[in-house]
């Protein structure tokens, strides 16, 4: 007798609560038929720093993805801003670091998308960049067929000095059958959309370790230069031209080291890295908050952002208190995303692939549908408190902390036109 048959008949009183002959079967093959459609990619246009407006042509009925292809898009778009307009009204806008440092680490809706990291820390494919508006992920779309009197436009604000040539913008278009197309054109629609809001604040850091590490780095550079000088001086025969040139380098490195050491010795932190950041200007039901700064290189100790503890307060009442950096990355991703990147540098208490931390009001940040929000429009005040903030020694002496809020809004489409229902 097979052990599987023994298992099958070995049922008792407790199993009444678990199984029934009338229950759901795991062995029914079910599927749903869908309406007829087709899809195809189309080249929208080539852009450069001199041609930054992309008018979306109506090549199909729906648009469900927009992306760029080119050479070294990471450096071309670094520091850029991407803004979406419908009928001349700005619907959404975000900086490059939202798509390079935040979206893949905290909001990706598939594993494949979460692995497509392109920032100064990790580069999967620098020749590809996808846009992340309310359409393009989670099988969402924008119904171009219903916008007979409004055009869709994407504007790019490149960073000063950026070089961008022969960048191709593509879109993925959906083509519908006549009956479903008629439904889109005749029906008023209220579409849930996401938007990005942003606040910037000069960051107060405890730079004691920052200046100590700068002095150590300057000392190492001086020692390396001096070692090379000694090797040149003991060479036989000596090269006086090379010795004189290296001596000048050593003198410069010594002066830089002495200056760095003097700065480190004299430095005292005026605030101990305490930051009280007002975020009351955010509006609408917010699903997620992100705070940090743009990743500028892969070596974490040179580039990191960390703090001892953080609070979030709403209407003067603590929502959370004295939470660690680990909580705002590992715990948030572990509990609130399906595909978040959880890697973390324990020595510097900083995420490995981003310099942003997160807090989610929602249950599932990867989902397009609402699973929880905090309506900032109904708050009198809100703030984030960061204590003992520290940064990597190759960051600028003065850094801006960037806080993003991802909120929900409603895009109403009616009679060939569209508009955002709730303004700021």
Segments (PLM) and residue ranges:
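Short, low-complexity Pro/Thr/Gly
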Residues: 1-209, 262-424
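Extended amphipathic alpha-helical heptad-repeat regions
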Residues: 205-263
């Amino acid at each position: 007798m097979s052990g599987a048959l023994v298992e099958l008949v070995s049922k008792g009183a407790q199993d009444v609560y678990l199984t029934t002959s009338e229950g759901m079967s795991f062995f029914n093959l079910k599927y749903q038929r869908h309406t007829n459609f087709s899809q195809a990619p189309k080249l929208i246009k080539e852009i450069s720093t001199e041609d930054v407006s992309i008018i979306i042509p109506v090549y199909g009925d729906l648009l469900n993805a927009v992306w760029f292809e080119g050479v070294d898009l990471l450096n071309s778009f670094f520091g850029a801003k991407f803004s979406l307009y419908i009928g001349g009204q700005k619907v959404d806008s975000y900086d490059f670091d939202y798509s390079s440092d935040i979206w893949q680490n905290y909001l990706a809706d598939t594993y494949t998308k979460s692995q497509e990291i392109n920032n100064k820390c990790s580069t999967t494919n620098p020749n590809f960049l996808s846009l992340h508006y309310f359409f393009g992920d989670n099988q969402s779309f924008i119904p171009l067929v219903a916008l007979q009197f409004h055009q869709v436009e994407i504007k790019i604000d490149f960073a000063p000095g950026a070089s961008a040539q022969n960048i191709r913008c593509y879109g993925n278009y959906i083509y519908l059958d006549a009956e479903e197309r008629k439904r889109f054109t005749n029906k008023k629609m209220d579409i849930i959309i996401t938007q990005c809001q942003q606040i910037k604040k000069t960051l107060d850091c405890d730079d004691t370790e920052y200046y100590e590490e700068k002095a150590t780095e300057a000392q190492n550079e001086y020692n390396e230069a001096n070692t090379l000088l000694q090797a040149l001086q003991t060479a036989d025969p000596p090269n006086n031209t090379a010795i004189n040139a290296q001596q000048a380098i050593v003198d410069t490195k010594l002066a830089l080291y002495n200056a760095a050491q003097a700065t480190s010795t004299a430095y005292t932190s005026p605030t101990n890295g305490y930051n009280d950041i007002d975020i009351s200007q955010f509006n609408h039901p917010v699903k997620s908050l992100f705070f940090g700064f743009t990743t500028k290189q892969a070596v974490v100790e040179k580039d990191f952002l960390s703090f001892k503890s953080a609070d979030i307060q709403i209407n003067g009442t603590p929502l959370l208190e004295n939470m660690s950096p680990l909580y705002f990355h590992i715990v948030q991703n572990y509990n609130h995303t399906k595909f978040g990147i959880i890697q973390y540098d324990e020595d510097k208490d900083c995420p490995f692939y981003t310099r942003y931390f997160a807090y989610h009001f929602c249950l599932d940040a990867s989902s397009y549908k609402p699973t929880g929000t905090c309506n900032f429009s109904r708050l009198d005040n809100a703030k984030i408190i960061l204590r003992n903030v520290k940064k990597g020694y190759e960051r600028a002496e003065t850094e801006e902390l960037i806080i993003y809020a991802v909120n929900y809004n409603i895009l109403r489409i009616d009679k060939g036109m569209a508009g955002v229902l709730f303004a700021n």
